[in-house]
């Protein structure tokens, strides 16, 4: 399923009213990778996250406790990383998706994790996953 298909399914699920919380370019140093040269060293990993909420209504009050606090995204990343080393970006991203889907307000999310330093030059490699709550 490509990103366009995912967004189409998302809109079918919620109608035409959707809020997206975003975290872009959140970079952490962490140990990850299966290759011998990746063992015992940290790499810069960039996270880009979209968290989808049903509805697009103005909060009843203009106060932080009326909305899902964006910091839960960064906290989820920190928690997943603190659980221990991952060999695969796919495992890391899947674990993060599951953590981000916990709040009742969340109906779906998209997570990308990108290794910034694995290749020389401008090349990057990464993994993206999209998931809707059932």
What are these regions (language model features)?
Residues 2-134:
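N-terminal, polar/charged subdomain of small-to-medium soluble alpha/beta proteins
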């Amino acid at each position: 399923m490509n990103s366009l298909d995912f967004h189409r399914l998302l809109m079918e699920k919620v109608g035409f009213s959707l809020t997206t919380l975003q975290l872009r370019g959140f970079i952490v140093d962490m140990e990850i990778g299966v290759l011998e040269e990746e063992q015992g060293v940290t790499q810069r990993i960039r996270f880009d996250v979209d968290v989808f909420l049903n509805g697009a209504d103005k909060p009843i009050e203009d106060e932080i406790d009326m909305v899902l606090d964006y910091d839960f995204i960064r906290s989820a990343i920190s928690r997943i990383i603190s659980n221990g080393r991952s060999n695969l970006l796919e495992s890391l991203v899947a674990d993060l998706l599951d953590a981000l889907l916990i709040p009742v307000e969340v109906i779906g999310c998209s997570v990308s994790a990108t290794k910034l330093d694995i290749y020389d030059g401008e090349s990057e490699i990464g993994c993206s996953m999209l998931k809707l709550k059932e």
